[in-house]
Amino acid sequence: MKKTVAVLFGGESKEHEISLQSSISIINAIDKKKYNIILIGVEKNGKIGIRSINNYILFKYNINYIKLAPAVSYLYIIPGKNNYQFYSLKNKKMLKIDVIFSILHGSNGENGAFQGLFNTIYTPFVGSNVLSSSICMDKDISKRILSTFGISVVPSITLYYENYKKKINKIINNIKFPCCIKPSNQGSSFGVNVANDFISLKESIDVAFLYSKKILIEPFIQGREIEVGVLGNRNVISSVCGEIKFKKIFYDYKEKYISKKTKIIIPAKISNEISNKIKKIAKLAFISLECSIMARVDFFLTKNKKIFLNEINTIPGFTKNSIYPKLWSKSGLDFKSLINKLILLTIYKK
């Protein structure tokens, strides 16, 4: 009997549109001979509803206009150990789901919120648990923990919105330029800026606080951006390393999803020694933060060969431009095989 996979996409975060694009690739890749599919769109206001396989996203291939198609039926969630997890309001039917494949990026999707919801309905889901998801989403907390395992991370100053005005003058005196200002719990480079002087620093702080009540100020690292994919539960494997080359001073939202000038080089043109070291650190970070199923780990590699772990993404992108599936493709696991592998890892997770 075929198992039923529910794909969740959309969400309330700033990365709503990226999630929609990722869902297209995943839905196309799921083996329909092996699995039944239920498409669940999460609207920007948080409403959850079933979408038709024939009409689930409008303006699919335009990042500026892409949006969820109207729901076929909104859903109630049924908590507890039940045979059914969702109730359809339109046709009054209960839905049984065996696996949840959530591609909800960012806050209230990648930060443990929905992972906790999945736990309340006792349904296995692709990705890390509540704790790991929450930690990895918070750049400040994840860096503190990774440091205790001897992993080099970019040093940072943490500012909280409620009291930063009392500390800002003292902090500014200790900052060297250029520096990078970023929200602690956002993805896709939302709210991230590089400051070269005190005026741009204060402006960048104000922008970052629009996205989060906690922000980080880091020294700007002049280096190459190297990324590696991690896959597994107890037996963790890593992909080849990839490098992202871009025109701007840093890899911002436009460079990630709009610019056609960004280049992805796989495998990265680095020595075997550096490559193996980065892959080893990626797996150590994945295990140290108790991640599971999948993650993309991002690094900076400086001219003098210093390696800094930048961040861990527990729900990496799956768009046509995303590096995570490309890394695995170059490692011998094509897109459809990768999606099937992720589902099987979830089903047989212990």
UniProtKB/Swiss-Prot annotation:
Pathway annotation: Cell wall biogenesis; peptidoglycan biosynthesis
Q: Which residues form a coiled coil?
A: none
- What is the annotated localization of this protein? Cytoplasm
The cofactor(s) it depends on are:
Mg(2+); Mn(2+)
Q: Could you tell me what the cofactor note in this record states?
A: Binds 2 magnesium or manganese ions per subunit.
Q: Domain of life of the organism in this record?
A: Bacteria
Tell me the residue numbers annotated for binding Mg(2+) 2.
Answer: E311, N313
Q: Which UniProt keywords apply?
A: ATP-binding, Cell shape, Cell wall biogenesis/degradation, Cytoplasm, Ligase, Magnesium, Manganese, Metal-binding, Nucleotide-binding, Peptidoglycan synthesis
Entry binding sites for Mg(2+) 1: D298, E311
Q: Which GO terms describe its biological process?
A: cell wall organization; peptidoglycan biosynthetic process; regulation of cell shape
The keyword NADP belongs to this UniProt entry's keyword annotation: no
Query: Care to name a GO molecular-function term for this sequence?
Result: ATP binding
Specify which residues bind ATP according to the UniProt entry for this protein.
Answer: 172-227
Q: What is its main location?
A: cytoplasm
Task: Give the record's GO CC terms.
Answer: cytosol
EC numbers for this chain: 6.3.2.4
Reactions performed catalytically: 2 D-alanine + ATP = D-alanyl-D-alanine + ADP + phosphate + H(+)
- Outline the extent of the ATP-grasp domain: 143-344
InterPro entries reported for this sequence = ATP-grasp, ATP_grasp_subdomain_1, D-Ala_lig_Van_CS, D_ala_D_ala, Dala_Dala_lig_C, Dala_Dala_lig_N, PreATP-grasp_dom_sf
Q: Which Pfam families match?
A: Dala_Dala_lig_C (PF07478), Dala_Dala_lig_N (PF01820)
Query: What is the top EC class of this enzyme, as a single word?
Result: ligase
What does it do?
Cell wall formation.
Q: What is the similarity comment for this entry?
A: Belongs to the D-alanine--D-alanine ligase family.
Protein name according to UniProt: D-alanine--D-alanine ligase
Question: Where does this protein come from, organism-wise?
Answer: Wigglesworthia glossinidia brevipalpis
